Amino acid sequence: LEFRRVLFRSATIKPFKGIRPPQDLVEQVASRPYDVLNSEEARAEAAGNDKSLYHIIKPEIDFPVGTDEHDEKVYAKAAENFRLFRDKGWLVQDDKENYYIYAQTMNGKTQYGLVVGAYVPDYMNGAIKKHELTRRDKEEDRMKHVRVNNANIEPVFFAYPDNAVLDAIIRKYTAQKPVYDFIAPGDGFGHTFWVIDNSEDIAVITKEFAAMPALYIADGHHRSAAAALVGVEKAKQNPNHRGDEEYNYFMAVCFPANQLTIIDYNRVVKDLNG
């Protein structure tokens, strides 16, 4: 039985009701990922902008300089700010479950990714492949963030095997006017976004992923681990767990393998300890 589960393993995804900014606010809300800058850099980038997502993903910026970013009051502030953003209409949930296309342009190259709900059991059983070890302290930090917000505020990036059917769907939508299209001042990258709301296209995308043997984490090992572990927690805490609840999925942007660029990730050893 165990062999059959491994042999016929496939990728499970689902559409979801995204929570996102109105078109006229997207440039004010958008931020860089939480782990590419420190607290003071985030504080500087968010200065004078109460709509910046940094108030949710780096909420220590709303406290005096030097506040421990892992203090419980900081996580509580993230949840408070997330509620505030929704109450004020700075983040609005879509009415129906969709897939999305997110394109990122940097150094003259554009990569197109499908934004999906990835399946927690796929992470736990190895259908989502990892290539990094994770640290428990960093996992717990992101787990607390997921718990207090009851949401994945930032996506993880996956890679998937090249697929002509998905390529055609992406081309069809990206030939249309995007919902968002802007260059972020923080990184100079282009960010473009489309909504896939056609039920037939949604069904085809789901089917094509189901035929894939695996997905591969390109970026976001700690966020993936945190989302999956919180999903497992919630399943254990729910006596009526069915397997189709929202906590069984987490937000991922999936890019085809032919659009990936492998970049050096170098380190300098300054001290050989004697």
Question: Predicted regions span which residues?
Answer:
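Surface-exposed, charge/polar-rich loops and edge strands
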Residues: 8-274
